[in-house]
């Protein structure tokens, strides 16, 4: 009987967690956190939004905005930016920390930053030449991937 109850509880928990996980739904830009809205107004003024959505994983909420030119911005639940991916153009200089911009322009003068991603451990930038550079939070280069 104990095994049956344990199995039933495990299946119920699995069903609930599966139902809550991986829930993506489109939203209006006005439903984004205030910081995310301000970021878009400042750095993507004049760009048309193709899709804004909220992504809910088990314990995490993120927002993603895709623009009609193919650029994408991803935000944490508090509205701080997580990733900016411009695919076909350079990430705006105002988004890139000055130390990273200086390193890239000094070491890769013919390349531009087309994607930047940050988390609580590091910054990752993708260059137009295909290289991916990783910097720690003190902006020291810690990895290069090609």
Q: Where are the model-predicted features located?
A:
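Bacterial Sec-dependent N-terminal signal peptides
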Residues: 1-24
